[in-house]
């Protein structure tokens, strides 16, 4: 029996500042305003399908992950693509960055997997990509693993999110309601993380006190970052706003972030990279 194969990749996303916009009951309209950086390293997924009763077998290469997330992606794909339901699927997932370290890996994994399944089915690239972002956003909101990572990844580069929500939605996969803009710069990035995983995202975005602190600090910074053009001339504005946000939201003082930042700063100074 002939097997079909598809590959999907998606880079990670580093949030620099954000708000929590979850008042709507519709997950498509939930999200965040904010800014961040998309990087090339993230997740690669290879999907293999054969005709048969629908099921999914998942294998993680060199790491561990959340099997439930990938089943949720496929379940949503079943609702939109009938051909996916007539397949026995195998999914191999390779992670190039750790999970639960603030790199938006759940969003990246959902996008990569959704793309892999659809490419295996031979669906057009643009349609597949839009549907992947749409599905990934809904999975993220269902699990409270993220707010704006998917919209950010859809924009790419150094991004700002100026309207909350999924980047694509509806049967025609039209743009919105989320709006994000990005500009790209081929810049090497050094990523650092703690040995042990940090708090789950839901511990912040679902907690009323954290939600208030984060949203107030994020809204203040986005009032200026949302105005005007968005290109490399805004880099210093972005860095200054991110530092102010981390202090005003008190996130810098939580989960030993300040210690990690200090260690990174000291390492940069020793290497002669500190500005």
Residue ranges and their predicted role:
Residues 1-99, 261:
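ATP-binding N-lobe of GHMP and related small-molecule kinases
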Residues 103-126:
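DPxDG-like acidic metal-binding loop motif
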Residues 4-6, 33-36, 101, 140-142, ...:
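A generic local secondary-structure boundary/capping motif
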Residues 230-275:
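Glycine-rich, charge-dense phosphate/pyrophosphate-binding loop(s)
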Residues 129-176:
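Alpha/beta catalytic cores of group-transfer enzymes, especially the acyltransferase/condensing modules
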């Amino acid at each position: 029996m002939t097997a079909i194969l598809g590959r999907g990749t998606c880079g990670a996303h580093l949030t620099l500042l954000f708000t929590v916009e979850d008042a709507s009951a519709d997950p498509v309209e939930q999200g965040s305003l904010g800014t961040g950086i998309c990087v090339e390293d993230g997740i690669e997924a290879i999907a293999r399908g054969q005709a048969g009763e629908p099921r999914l077998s998942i294998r993680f290469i060199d790491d561990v992950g959340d099997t439930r997330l990938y089943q949720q992606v496929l379940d949503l794909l079943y609702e939109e693509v009938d051909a996916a339901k007539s397949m026995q699927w195998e999914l191999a997932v390779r992670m190039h960055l750790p999970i639960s370290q603030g790199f938006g890996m759940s969003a990246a994994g959902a996008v990569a997997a959704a793309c892999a399944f659809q490419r295996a089915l031979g669906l057009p690239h643009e349609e597949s990509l839009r549907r992947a972002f749409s599905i990934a956003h809904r999975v993220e909101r269902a699990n409270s693993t993220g707010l704006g990572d998917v919209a950010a990844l859809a924009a790419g580069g150094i991004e700002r999110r100026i309207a909350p929500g999924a980047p694509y939605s509806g049967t025609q996969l039209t743009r919105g309601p989320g709006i994000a803009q990005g500009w790209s710069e081929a810049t090497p990035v050094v990523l650092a993380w703690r040995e042990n995983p940090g708090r789950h995202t839901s511990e912040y975005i679902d907690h009323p006190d954290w939600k208030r602190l984060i949203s107030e600090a994020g809204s203040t910074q986005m009032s200026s970052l949302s105005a005007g053009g968005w290109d490399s001339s805004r880099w210093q504005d972005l860095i200054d706003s991110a530092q102010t946000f981390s202090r005003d939201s008190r996130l810098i003082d939580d989960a030993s972030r300040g210690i990690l930042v200090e260690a990174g700063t000291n390492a940069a100074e020793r290497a002669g990279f500190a500005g």
